Structures are given as C-alpha cells and as structure tokens.
Amino acid sequence: YNPNEYVHFRLSAGKGYRTNHVLAENNYLLSSSRKVEIAKGLDMEEAWNYGASVSTYVPVFGKTLNINAEYYYTDFLKQVVVDMDSNPHEVAFYNLDGRSYSHVFQVEASYPFFKGFTLTGAYRLTDAQTTYKGQRMEKPLTSKYKGLLTASYQTPLGIWQFDATFQLNGGGRMPVPYELANGQL
C-alpha cells in the first residue's frame, strides 16, 4: 500500500514447510565432543509467518534518506529442536513438544552524504524462544540484538568500492555447561 510517493507499507503472511537436515545444518556441534542423539521419526518443520514493513524516503538537503522498519513473527507448529541444555555431554535432536516462536524487529537508515559515499545504519532486536523438555527458554547462541554501521565509498568510475563496517552483537543465552547434582554447584 502506497499512501504517497514517499511511504510504502507491506504486509505478508504465509505458511512454510521445511525439511531439516540436522547434521548438515549443525555440523559445528560435531567438534564439541558431545554425544549426538537423533530421535527417530523427525517431522518436517511447519510454521506460520507474519510480517509488516514500512519504507519511507525523506528528502534531506537535495538527497534521499531511506528509512525501513520491519517486524516479522514466526510461530512454529512443528520444529526439530536442537537441545544442548538437557545434558551437557550430549546434543539431542527431537520434535517440538510445546511452543516455539520468533519475533524480529529491524530498523535501517541509509543516506548518501556526497557522491560515492553512503552511510548505512541498522539495528535488529530478536526474541526467539523454544520449549525444551517442557520448559520454554530463549534459543541458545542467538543474539538478542545486533547493530551495524557501514560507511561505503565508490570511486567516480565505479571500478573500486571501499567499505568500513562496525558491528555490535548483543549477548545471548549459552547452554548450561555443567550438571547440577542435588541442586548444588
């Protein structure tokens, strides 16, 4: 939907299916010395996806400032869970028994300060949670937030381009690396 030439709204919704290839997609876990347990009869993943975005173009000093904001929500009906928390000596793959979802909000701005030089900034906030053996927790190894700032310069003939990128990664949950014996550390 375009109410005028400077603002564009988009909505999307759909259902997706995906076959999970547990070893190919999680091969980094093979170097962790954990025993790999793969449940029999893993289901094809199934999820509903919803999204909304707005793009706006603001004239500033004869140039165009582009601002984009988007929000996406994914609700998993079926998912292969990668469980690194139940046992610190193994990684288990099994079908979701509970709820799993992801909320992602991102905003981005880009402005060409002078011919060939563009500055772009972006920020993303993520809330991804999954049920592990009856307990809903934040997905491990997933950053809660991420910031990005890129300065880009392209030479007048367009042959060379130079970029400097600064990145900020927010903390995320780490799997528990030890077992609790009788609630003691």
Where are these regions (language model features)?
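Short, intrinsically disordered, charge-balanced linker/junction segments flanking boundaries
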Residues: Y1, E5, A164, E179-L185
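Residue-level signature of outer-membrane beta-barrel architecture
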Residues: Y1-P3, K15, M44, T56-V58, ...
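Signature of Gram-negative outer-membrane beta-barrel scaffolds
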Residues: Y1-V7, T19, L30
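Membrane-embedded beta-barrel scaffold of Gram-negative outer-membrane proteins
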Residues: N2, H8-R10, D43-N95, Y101
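Outer-membrane beta-barrel translocator domains and adjoining extracellular loop/strand segments
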Residues: V22-L30, K35-E37, Q79-P88, T126-E138, ...
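Exposed loop/turn and edge beta-strand positions of beta-sandwich/beta-sheet ligand-binding modules
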Residues: V36-I38, W48, K63, H103, ...
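Outer-membrane beta-barrel proteins
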Residues: K40-M44, K139
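Gram-negative outer-membrane beta-barrel transporters
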Residues: N66-L77, F93-Y178
